[in-house]
Amino acid sequence: GAGVEPVVFLSVIGADRTPLVPHARLESWRVEAGLETTFLRASFFMQNLSTTHREEIREGRLAVPAGDGKTSFVDARDVAAVAVRAIQTGSTGAYDLTGPEALDYEAVCHLLSSVLDHDVEYTDPSIPRFLASRYRRDRDFAKAGVMVAIYTTARLGLADRGTDDVRSVRDRPPTDLLTFICDNRSA
């Protein structure tokens, strides 16, 4: 190696089963090169709600083309804690990191509404409408395209898988979405 082993590599959940995502190629390259690596395959970060979707949530809505599909959100703080443990122990392999439950976006909006000082409504825009709206907001078509891919996996029922990997590494349950929302209500 290059004297920088082992490496902890942040990937995406399903990279081992989805060759189209760039993470799959990077994971394969590291394995084929014989490089000691811990792969952290994270589900959808809870932090996306308090960053990427912050303004629309403040406006009382969350518009994503996820249909009634569920997502097993993960707190980036849990992912970071698993990364630290992997570095401390020198463990290698792969961890699929999710939260404790899979929720649809109606349920997400219900949780947001229960904590915030206003109601948040879920709307399920068409993909063209979502792309246009995100482009107007961010001026970044590539980002909007990635978001469509992410929400399409939820729509198709491919984002609802949960694992015990956070619990097994940290000896405590992963953060649930309600706790995350309470911790970040001022965001």
Residue ranges and their predicted role:
Residues 2-6, 12-121, 125, 132-137, ...:
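Oxidoreductase cofactor-interface core, primarily capturing Rossmann-like NAD(P)-dependent enzymes
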Residues 127-187:
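A hydrophobic C-terminal alpha-helical subdomain
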